[in-house]
Amino acid sequence: MAITAALVKELRDSTGAGMMDAKKALTETDGDMEAAVDWLRTKGLAKAAKKSGRTAAEGLVAVVVEGGKGVAVEVNSETDFVAKNSDFQEMVGKIAAAALAADDVDALLAADLGGKSVADTLTAKIATIGENMSVRRLAKLEGETVVTYVHNAATTGMGKIGVLVAMKGGDEALGKQVAMHIAAVNPAALSEAEMDPVVVEKEKQVQMDIARESGKPEAVIEKMIEGRMKKFVAESTLLSQQFVVNPDLTVGAAAAEAGAEITGFVRLEVGEGIVVEKEDFAAEVAKAAQG
């Protein structure tokens, strides 16, 4: 695969690596961006392992709870200007309410919304506002108590990040604090048992490669890897993370101290994982001039 300047720039932007290091990483991994990031980490050359490109999608995440059931829905628009539009926000709120009864995005798009489907409602709104929109994803959560939190709220119940927390015991104040923690820290899973084994194995392999670069005895390397993996899991899982409200306790310990148990969570962030290629201003003007 040809290693283009654009690929090198993307890797440099996401890792902070130097130009020659980024080019070598891509050459060694045949242009595979994720593998190149891991290669840089192994060599100690990546300043930040951001494995996704810049997120440029706009829109809102809305959260709704009814009884012990909650749902978070992401509805995308092309610009933040539309996300601030009251008509768009009203539509997102109605879509989120309908999502409580939907199992997935396809079912939600087919759901009735005031006499027409959600899909048809979106089509009509696109025609009115003049900008493309889509329901990207939804996530549901059930529990004894489900608490919501919205970060960067555009209006009640919707914003740039939406969080649901399911609990047994405790009170809403604790749930809100945990939800704010989740919004800020973005844990990968509730506990070690719920972590993606592929992610864990990949991290273990990276740490093995880093440790072996040290040239230390195998017994020492095994201890190094064990310690680093414990730290990785602790930093990645909600219940083991230091609670932002009280760093002396983990989230799990803080919940237990309050007589509560966190049983699940959902976190959706607008545009998360979407990479949108940006044209430079001159190219944008040229395209507009061509109609």
Swiss-Prot record:
It comes from the Bacteria. Associates with the EF-Tu.GDP complex and induces the exchange of GDP to GTP. It remains bound to the aminoacyl-tRNA.EF-Tu.GTP complex up to the GTP hydrolysis stage on the ribosome. The gene is tsf. InterPro entries: EF-Ts_dimer_sf, Transl_elong_EFTs/EF1B, Transl_elong_EFTs/EF1B_dimer, Transl_elong_Ts_CS, UBA-like_sf. PROSITE patterns: EF_TS_1, EF_TS_2. Residues 79-82 are annotated as: Involved in Mg(2+) ion dislocation from EF-Tu. Keywords: Cytoplasm, Elongation factor, Protein biosynthesis. Belongs to the EF-Ts family. NCBIfam families: tsf. CDD domains: UBA_EF-Ts. GO terms for molecular function: translation elongation factor activity. One of its GO terms (cellular component) is cytoplasm. It comes from Ruegeria pomeroyi (strain ATCC 700808 / DSM 15171 / DSS-3). This is Elongation factor Ts. It holds the Pfam family EF_TS. It is found in: Cytoplasm. Transmembrane segments: none annotated.
